[in-house]
Amino acid sequence: MFLAYEAIKMWKKTALYVLAGLLMGLAVCIRVTSIFILLAIMVWILVSRNWKKLLQWGVPTLTGMILFSILWQGIYQYHVDFDTSESAITVEHFVMMGSTGDGMYNWDDVLFTKSFATHEERAENNRRVWLQRVRENGLLGNLKLIIKKEEIVWGIGASGYSQYVENVVEQTPCYDWMVGEKSGLFRAYMQAYNIVLFALILLGTVTMISKKKSNPYMWIIGIYWCGALVFYIFWEAHPRYSVSIVPLLTMLIVPCLEICLFDMNHGQ
């Protein structure tokens, strides 16, 4: 999308936007939260009232996503020649799971959802339990849960990495230092890095907001982050969920660095 935005020739812009749509379609299949960046771009265009950009960018990108959807459905139906909708976990299940305890994955909720035979029954009962939990939590309880979930998603520097290396074949000294009994130093380093990183991201965000004119890319990423924050108010929480988002958020540090470099160059 960046290449398409910077391209001068119209045919090249259109081709790159279609390609971006194809790639975005694939990304959404892998992880649905990938669509947040598209929504952020749309919000920025609507807020800036640049309707020409919306048509110039939106139509070819949407075309690319539709093309990918058609191709994907054909490939999926060829390789999976049976209906998977009845056995699939519902969207409501993950919202329900995020409404109790610390808002993280729990096996009891999985067993509850699987106890119903049809997709409609699962969705209906997931919604019923979610509403019941929201009422039982009360205003203060829901607020505390939201804060806890955001802390889990954004505040844990280790990003839940240890659960992916628990079943190694051989526990070497490197394993001990990174995951095992001697991993305290490594975990402390990751947490310290995460604190510094988000402090800089927040500082850069404040700098961007305070500037009269900011790069549109920065605003798009800021809106993207706001969307993710809202999403995890409702969704089940896990430290790994921030891993695919943080690389983009690091770009929000740029406005702060620009001011620092400007001050250094002018001897301030």
Short names for language-model regions:
Residues 13-15, 50-63:
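Membrane-interfacial entry segments at the cytosolic side of transmembrane helices
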Residues 33-48, 58:
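Transmembrane-embedded, aromatic-rich helix segments that form part
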Residues 77-171:
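Membrane-proximal stem/loop segments at transmembrane-domain junctions that anchor or position
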